[in-house]
């Protein structure tokens, strides 16, 4: 990931959030955990982060699940929205600057669609849905590399595309809203584009995030709408994370092959998944296995020990090394960053390593020795000076137990 941050200090950033009809799986957290770490690295360099994250709380899947359970869409989405917020806390992910539910902004979304209609980018399809005409956008395909010719509908003599997408779906099934376009609800691509347009006051984002699976059609269609209204791309920089597979197979609810984030947190230290996600370059697929989890469990224990050892040897951190590693994370060069961390570990640069871990927001960096325990380090130092190593080891072991349980 290469970001153009020249002459910028305030960054506007957006990440598509979950569709809240069920619990999120561990793969859903890859982008937001990476963002959480990168944002802290950027703040360390003096950047201010304005981060918008949406909650999709109206969708066909939500309606179907609510009807299946015999409850309202609002009851269902409130439950899973709150569950998602709990997950963010458990995995030590800072809440975004602003979280917005789609249903809170229906009027703004309708206004957005009106602007697209007024500018002549829409038509009604055979179902009487209001649809966006992608052929009106000369650079459609610029985000995903799609060729417009390949998207044309052969049955309409090349005047329409199979990929024209719904702005407003006409329906009275489940939750619906009044609008000039009829009773219905907005399309997913339009929800995100409208929220970005409204919250960031028509400006292009500095960074838009999401999974690689969203490049087409979602990101392409967001960009098309923003370009239609402003003549500018929706984002100057894109960050996309690769797939997270489980035991060699795609992790997906539809395939019944998932590891829920809450189940992961019950079984493992949440820092383990942060370590995994920050060890592999963002776009590279990850195959989550017991062996990989076990390896990173050992790594986290090693990192914890380094933070403990810092109390016994608080030499000055090497600021230039901290900056070098954090810059690599910002650039998405995670493998190189981790190589440098391992070199610093060999050199026993505990202060430098601890500073890096603080910026990557590992939960174990909150582990502390209280003032009373730190006083015991003075006794430890004296015992070392007196070459009473057995008693010194006892104090060290006692302090390690206190540190681990802090």
From Swiss-Prot:
A motif ('HIGH' region) lies at residues 18-28. SUPFAM superfamilies: Nucleotidylyl transferase. Its cofactor is Zn(2+). The keyword Cytoplasm applies. Keywords: Aminoacyl-tRNA synthetase, ATP-binding, Cytoplasm, Ligase, Metal-binding, Nucleotide-binding, Protein biosynthesis, Zinc. It catalyses: tRNA(Cys) + L-cysteine + ATP = L-cysteinyl-tRNA(Cys) + AMP + diphosphate. It holds the Pfam family tRNA-synt_1e. The keyword Metal-binding applies. Binds 1 zinc ion per subunit. Its EC number is 6.1.1.16. Zn(2+) binds at residues 16, 192, 218, 222. A motif ('KMSKS' region) lies at residues 250-254. It is found in: Cytoplasm. One of its GO terms (biological process) is cysteinyl-tRNA aminoacylation. It is an enzyme of class 6 (ligase). InterPro entries: Cys-tRNA-ligase (IPR015803), Cys-tRNA/MSH_ligase (IPR024909), Rossmann-like_a/b/a_fold (IPR014729), tRNA-synt_1_cat_dom (IPR032678). It comes from the Bacteria. PANTHER family: CYSTEINE--TRNA LIGASE, CYTOPLASMIC, CYSTEINYL-TRNA SYNTHETASE. Belongs to the class-I aminoacyl-tRNA synthetase family. This is Cysteine--tRNA ligase.
């Amino acid at each position: 990931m290469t970001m153009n941050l020249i002459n910028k200090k305030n960054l506007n950033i957006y990440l598509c959030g979950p569709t809240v009809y069920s619990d999120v799986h561990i793969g859903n957290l890859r982008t937001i955990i990476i963002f959480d770490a990168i944002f802290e690295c950027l703040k360390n360099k003096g950047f201010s982060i304005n981060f918008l994250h949406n909650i999709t709380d109206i969708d066909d899947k939500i309606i179907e699940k609510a009807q299946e359970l015999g409850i309202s869409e609002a009851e269902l989405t409130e439950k899973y929205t709150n569950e998602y917020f709990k997950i963010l806390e458990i995995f030590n992910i800072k809440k975004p600057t602003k979280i917005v539910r789609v249903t809170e902004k229906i009027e703004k979304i309708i206004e957005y669609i009106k602007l697209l209609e007024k500018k002549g980018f829409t038509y009604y399809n055979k179902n009487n849905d209001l649809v966006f005409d992608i052929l009106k956008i000369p650079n459609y395909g610029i985000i995903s590399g799609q060729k417009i010719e390949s998207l044309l509908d052969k049955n309409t003599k090349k005047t329409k595309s199979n990929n024209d997408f719904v702005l407003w779906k006409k329906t009275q099934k489940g939750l619906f809203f009044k609008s000039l376009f009829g009773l219905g609800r907005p399309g997913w691509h339009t929800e995100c584009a409208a929220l970005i347009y409204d919250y960031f006051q028509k400006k292009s984002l500095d960074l838009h995030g999401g999974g690689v699976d969203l490049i087409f059609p979602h990101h392409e269609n967001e960009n098309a709408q923003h370009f239609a209204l402003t003549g500018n791309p929706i984002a100057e920089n894109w960050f996309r994370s690769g797939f997270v597979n489980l035991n060699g197979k795609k992790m997906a609810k539809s395939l019944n092959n998932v590891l829920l984030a809450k189940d992961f947190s019950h079984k493992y230290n949440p820092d383990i998944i942060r370590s995994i996600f920050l060890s592999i370059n963002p776009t590279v697929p990850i195959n989550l296995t017991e062996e990989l989890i076990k390896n990173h469990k050992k790594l986290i224990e090693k990192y914890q020990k380094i933070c403990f050892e810092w109390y016994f040897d608080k030499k000055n951190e090497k600021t230039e090394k901290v900056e070098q590693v954090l810059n690599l994370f910002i650039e998405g060069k995670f493998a190189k960053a981790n190589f440098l961390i391992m070199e610093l570990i060999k050199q026993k640069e505990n202060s430098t390593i601890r500073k890096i871990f603080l910026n990557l927001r590992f939960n174990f960096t909150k582990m502390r020795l209280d003032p009373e325990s730190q006083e015991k380090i003075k006794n430890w130092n004296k015992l070392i000076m007196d070459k009473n190593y057995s008693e010194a080891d006892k104090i060290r072991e006692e302090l390690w137990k206190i540190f681990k349980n802090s």
